[in-house]
C-alpha cells in the first residue's frame, strides 16, 4: 500500500479539524461557496457540506469516491472534486478557503504564486481557515523543498485580512502515518477586508 493510501485510511474516520469546527460554530458562517485545498480523506469537506456549504474539494490524488461515499444524495449536490496539484492550480471566487496541513507541501519556490492565487480568489468578507509550518518543525531539516515560514511571514500574508484567530503550536505528536515528529504550526482564521 502506498503511504498516501495508508494516510487516507488512517485519517478517514477522524472528525473535522478544530479550526473548521470553530469557524462554523463560533463565527456562525453556515453557507456559501468553499474550496478545500489538499482535502485528503475529506473530513473538513464533509463537515462543511453537512453544515450547508457548497464545497469544491481539491487534491493531487483521486479521493473523490472516498468523500462521496460519506454523503447522501442531497449532500452530493453540494460536492465537487478536482484533481490538481498546486503548481497548476486555478481557483474560482469563493467565500472560504480551507487549507489544513497542505500549504507547507507546496514547493517553496512556488509558494508566493500559490498564495497570490488564494488571496485573489477569496471574496471580500470571505475567510481563510488553515495552517502553515514554522521554522522549528522537524521536517524543515529533511524536506528542503517544502515551505516553512516565520511568524512574521505568516502575519504578512494576511495584510489584506482581519486576523480573527492566530495560534502558534509547538509540540511533539504523530503524523497521519502514525510516526512521531516535532510540529511547529501556525493556525490562522482570517476575514478578507
Features from the language model and the residues they span:
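Class I (Rossmann-like) S-adenosyl-L-methionine-dependent methyltransferase catalytic domain
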Residues: 1-31, 35, 40-90, 109-113, ...
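A conserved beta-strand element that flanks and buttresses the S-adenosyl-L-methionine
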Residues: 98
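Short catalytic micro-motifs in class I SAM-dependent methyltransferases
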Residues: 101-102
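ABC ATPase nucleotide-binding domain "signature" loop
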Residues: 105
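A short glycine-rich, Lys/Arg-flanked "PGG" loop and its adjoining helix->strand segment in the class I
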Residues: 112-124
Amino acid at each position: 500500500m502506498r503511504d498516501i493510501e495508508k494516510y487516507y485510511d488512517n485519517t478517514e474516520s477522524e472528525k473535522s479539524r478544530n479550526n473548521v469546527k470553530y469557524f462554523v460554530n463560533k463565527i456562525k458562517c453556515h453557507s456559501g461557496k468553499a474550496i478545500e485545498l489538499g482535502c485528503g480523506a475529506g473530513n473538513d469537506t464533509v463537515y462543511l457540506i453537512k453544515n450547508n456549504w457548497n464545497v469544491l474539494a481539491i487534491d493531487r490524488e483521486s479521493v473523490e469516491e472516498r468523500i462521496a461515499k460519506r454523503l447522501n444524495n442531497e449532500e452530493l449536490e453540494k460536492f465537487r472534486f478536482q484533481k490538481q496539484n498546486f503548481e497548476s492550480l486555478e481557483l474560482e471566487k469563493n467565500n472560504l478557503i480551507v487549507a489544513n496541513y497542505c500549504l507547507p507541501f507546496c514547493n517553496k519556490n512556488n509558494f508566493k504564486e500559490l498564495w497570490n492565487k488564494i488571496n485573489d480568489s477569496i471574496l471580500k468578507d470571505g475567510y481563510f481557515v488553515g495552517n502553515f509550518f514554522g521554522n522549528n518543525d522537524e521536517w524543515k531539516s529533511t524536506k528542503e523543498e517544502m515551505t516553512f515560514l516565520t511568524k512574521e511571514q505568516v502575519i504578512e500574508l494576511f495584510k489584506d485580512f482581519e486576523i480573527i484567530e492566530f495560534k502558534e503550536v509547538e509540540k511533539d505528536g504523530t503524523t497521519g502515518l502514525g510516526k512521531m515528529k516535532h510540529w511547529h504550526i501556525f493556525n490562522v482564521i482570517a476575514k478578507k477586508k
